[in-house]
């Protein structure tokens, strides 16, 4: 793959920062106007920590199955949660291999997994949400989809360049 020019690289970094800020707002600060001092104090009490660990979903596909089977939950809410967890991380699957010149798909997918894990741990540790392994699965799937899109685009560009070279 051809080297990315400095201005394009800066633009890609700005996109990554924007994506991370949007994800942080939607994952960590959803529905909050501010993180109060009282919230911080509660977050670090032993009772608060135990409560968050008790609420954490560590069993894969529990939330996904619940959403699939539930008749009482609003369909828009269920789809927004499931699809949002996937779609929100697609840009990372596209941007990470471009910014870090990762040649193998597992590197990009693992990078997305680590970012998702960071968000989930932040929710758990700072009482900003509930840790859910299903979110990790869906976020990582989004990263994989993003990488597949990157790979397809890269293949098309390579093919076009080969054709241009063959013509010249």
Q: What residue spans do the PLM features occupy?
A:
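Alpha-helical transmembrane segments that form the membrane-embedded catalytic/substrate-binding core
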Residues: 127, 131-150
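Bulky hydrophobic segments
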Residues: 1-128, 151-168
